[in-house]
Amino acid sequence: MFTEDKVTEIFFMADEFCGFFDSRMEKYALRDHKKRIYHRESTMSKSEIMVIIILFHNSGYRCMKHFYVEQVCRHMRHLFPKVVSYNRFVELERDVAIPLALFIKKVLLGKCTGISFVDSTPLRVCRNQRIHIHKVFKGIAQRGKCSLGWFFGFKLHLICNEKGELLNFMITPGDVDDRRPLEYKAFVDFIYGKLVGDRGYISKNLF
């Protein structure tokens, strides 16, 4: 777990980023003025929610609910005095999905050391038996195959260094070949030295 000083540092960076992000969205985002938007204001800020998500992924917990209830609500109330119920927190998570991804891309990525590793992992959106009735990601998620078999959803492509620091990531539909992201210059342009992957990444186009 991070120290309180480190949590405060991450919160400061996240809060500064959210302020900039919201100002850009307010200025440039397109709006549908025909629809009346009902928006329930949250007592927790976007930056607080982002920090809690970051803390969870560094905590060793496998269940977000257990982490939120046992750690945040019990032992971190002095850091997050306006915590909401877990159900409400889950609702608020979707509001920070885009700013969190951009925050990680711009602020939290590590640096290439000359030895990097690339791999992908499936992000399932539903069980295979429910594919035909799935609506949330209909038209976006696709059937894919990994070492564990067929799945329906997306693929998370990751590059990290030998210290375990995340260097870059990309999310694609499940049917995208693992080698495809490596063909995008922006995904690997900063990588130098050796890039290690399994045999699924062998391709003439990558050499």
Model-derived features: where do they sit?
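Short alpha-helical elements
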Residues: 1-207
